[in-house]
């Protein structure tokens, strides 16, 4: 038994300069784990609650002293003496302590930080890497795979101050033979894209996730400049590199219409599905996340019938890493993939349950960061330990993004031949 001896919560800053919650968990043996909760910008309405103070005189109301107090005053006394190796029990105690469906009493940010710190302390107690401990918890011991990265190199929507409506334009180095090679390919394309944008007189400042945020005439132009950059970097579209979108469509869904204000266009649900189908026919787009609003289930069903056999349709705001909502989606033929963000649900155990449910149903699971991140690289270990197959953790700059890529490099090196990089076959429909 690895008894918890001390838990400390504190307020730290995330990559956007906003406060977030960090937790330290100490065991009687001296083993220790530390983890921080991330924070999103475009959030699904059904996400677990991120507890903020609301005191406008401090951090513009975004302080997290209430969540920190929940750790120090409520969670800590309940977990002292408990076994850190029993992750499901630990998470269950915190969920019961909170007592609400969306974790609004203690805050998902408080519960998650402790949940992840407990897992890290348990890994330290066992003397194993975090991905190995996660694999043990997940029942996937020894079944490791290196994830195909979705690299967000052009930002729009809620992640940037520009006129591009689609939130993320991503490249996937599917033709790489290893994660190390995939990362190099992505970095070379990122630098090539900067040159392409500069040559066109476009802005090369970056958004929250490290991608460029230029003003472009259309979403199609964003795809065109990426294709140019890929080719300039010496790679072949659809062979070495495929494309992925995160529309974050709930952000531009207004009164039953999908409004692309940057292009001065408006679509009903069926027509916007056709728009996405056309884009994926013109370009090698093999994955579309949140292509429709989180409440537009009829539209999602139609889009899934339309292109779900050849394009990965990822539910983020749609499913919010929640098994109850995911089950409805599976039962009703909605999408074919889930985005996994552990702060949407608020504990490691519930996150693992969502990944398992998705995989058992033939869905893919894409492990994801949030736009507000820290140096915490737990999602890298989560992706490898669950053999999820895909990860989305931003562009090829900003330390909060690169921290995850660097951790994946270390894991691949440590695993050696056991680290398989399967490339294109990890993506649903490919």
Curated annotation (Swiss-Prot):
Instruction: State the pathway, as annotated in the record.
Output: Carbohydrate degradation; glycolysis; pyruvate from D-glyceraldehyde 3-phosphate: step 4/5
Q: Does the keyword Metal-binding apply?
A: yes
User: What biological-process terms (Gene Ontology) are attached?
Assistant: glycolytic process
Q: Where is the protein situated, by its record's location annotation? A: Cytoplasm; Secreted; Cell surface
Q: Which Pfam families match?
A: Enolase_C (PF00113), Enolase_N (PF03952)
Chain residues that bind Mg(2+): 246, 289, 316
The reply to whether Cytoplasm figures as a keyword in the UniProt entry is yes
> Matching PANTHER family, A to Z?
ENOLASE
Q: What function does this protein fulfil?
A: Catalyzes the reversible conversion of 2-phosphoglycerate (2-PG) into phosphoenolpyruvate (PEP). It is essential for the degradation of carbohydrates via glycolysis.
**Protein name (Swiss-Prot/TrEMBL):** Enolase
Q: Gene name on record?
A: eno
